[in-house]
């Protein structure tokens, strides 16, 4: 078995703690450190109990250590990561960014998982992006998509202070991802924090404008194939019904449309199952980290064989 890549988690909130449990199961990644700024954080306490080295002194502490991680997963906030990103790169640490900072290229596994495995910093877009961009990609690889709009509805109970502070970045980063990763010519993103009790699981609606005469069967099959791919790392990701095709009308702006409805139920590793919006972020980040670690291990084996 190849040597695992060592990992530091920067941030000690809900997303970081859920991520920790996923990383502990990984065959390719070894979480060694968790870094925060609150000494009383439940995340740091859990990490210590699980054998990680922890600190509440932030990134300064991590970068001052003689041994540094191969990978950093950062789940803080956009402005914090923008400050830290150049410091990670200078230290030779690859960064997987779970904030909307978008310092590095965005990665959504079904769309472009292998395109940026050598980048020093990759961005996981947003929870809404991870849930909806695969569908836009599924449609755009069959037909041109002049416009795509996504509506992500998540439980208010799953939106902590970090999520709420990042709402503006969420809409900008997700809209850009719908275009740059999903393949739509124009994109728009809307997030809804639903206060319903008991909390509802994440539900997303994806509208894609398509050409007249588009092959509905091919689009439907492409969507189902992508859903199956996402389910390999997020088992609770599913279609709510068959993709719906609509003729042009005043309501839809005169476009031929395909509308897809998905829901995301979390695995319940640390966060409750209704927090599928957070679970899909940590699961996708783990998937990307494992692919980076695999490529690094393959490169090491190849160089060793040549020597």
From Swiss-Prot:
| Enzyme type, top EC level | oxidoreductase
Q: Does this UniProt record's set of keywords contain Aminoacyl-tRNA synthetase?
A: no
Pfam families xrefs: AcetDehyd-dimer
**Superkingdom of the organism of origin:** Bacteria
* Annotated InterPro entries: Acetaldehyde_dehydrogenase, Acetylaldehyde_DH_C, NAD(P)-bd_dom_sf, Semialdehyde_DH_NAD-bd
Q: Name one GO biological process term.
A: catabolic process
Enumerate the GO terms in the molecular function aspect.
acetaldehyde dehydrogenase (acetylating) activity; NAD binding
Reported EC number(s) for this entry are 1.2.1.10
Q: Which reaction does it catalyse?
A: acetaldehyde + NAD(+) + CoA = acetyl-CoA + NADH + H(+)
SUPFAM superfamilies, alphabetically?
Glyceraldehyde-3-phosphate dehydrogenase-like, C-terminal domain (SSF55347), NAD(P)-binding Rossmann-fold domains (SSF51735)
Q: State the UniProt keywords alphabetically.
A: Aromatic hydrocarbons catabolism, NAD, Oxidoreductase
Binding residues annotated for NAD(+), in chain numbering: 12-15, 158-166, 277
Which residues are the signal sequence here?
Answer: none
- Read off the SMART domains from this record: Semialdhyde_dh (SM00859)
Catalytic site positions:
127 (acyl-thioester intermediate)
What the record says about family reads: Belongs to the acetaldehyde dehydrogenase family.
The record, for HAMAP family, names: Ac_ald_DH_ac (MF_01657)
Protein's UniProt name: Acetaldehyde dehydrogenase 2
Q: Which organism is it from?
A: Mycolicibacterium smegmatis (strain ATCC 700084 / mc(2)155)
